[in-house]
A protein has these predicted regions:
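Long, low-complexity, intrinsically disordered segments
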Residues: 105-115
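Claisen-condensing/thiolase-fold acyl-transfer catalytic domains that form or cleave C-C bonds
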Residues: 1-101, 112-113
């Protein structure tokens, strides 16, 4: 439900940074979020490479944002979790396409990217 509400299925996903503390979590989350087989998951190494307490979820968001800012991807999913049995989840879709304001043009020098 969180992935659907965040808009995961609203367009192609280039990369997904998933909070997967165990290898089987990737298969579960990939399936439940409906991520295509060609979506690159955890190119950073994810929490299996480093899982700092209380920051691992924010790192997932930062990893996707960084890839959008450097131009390697256009749209990505970041997932964070906490609590027992993964019952507390956050899914964020970050998009590199610049949004237009109601006047039809962007008025900010800040990079777009959150949803």
């Amino acid at each position: 439900l969180a992935a659907e509400a965040a808009g995961v299925g609203d367009g192609p996903i280039d990369v997904a940074e998933l909070h997967t503390c165990f290898t089987h979590h990737e298969a579960i989350l990939r399936n439940e979020m409906g991520l295509a087989d060609d979506v690159v998951v955890n190119p950073s190494g994810g929490p299996l490479a480093a899982n700092p307490m209380m920051a691992a979820g924010m790192i997932r968001i930062g990893e996707v944002a960084n890839r959008i800012f450097d131009g390697t991807v256009n749209r990505g999913v970041a997932h964070a979790t906490g609590g027992h049995l993964m019952q507390h989840n956050l899914v964020a879709v970050l998009d590199g396409e610049q949004s237009a304001t109601s006047e039809g043009s962007s008025t900010s020098d800040e990079p777009e990217g959150g949803r």
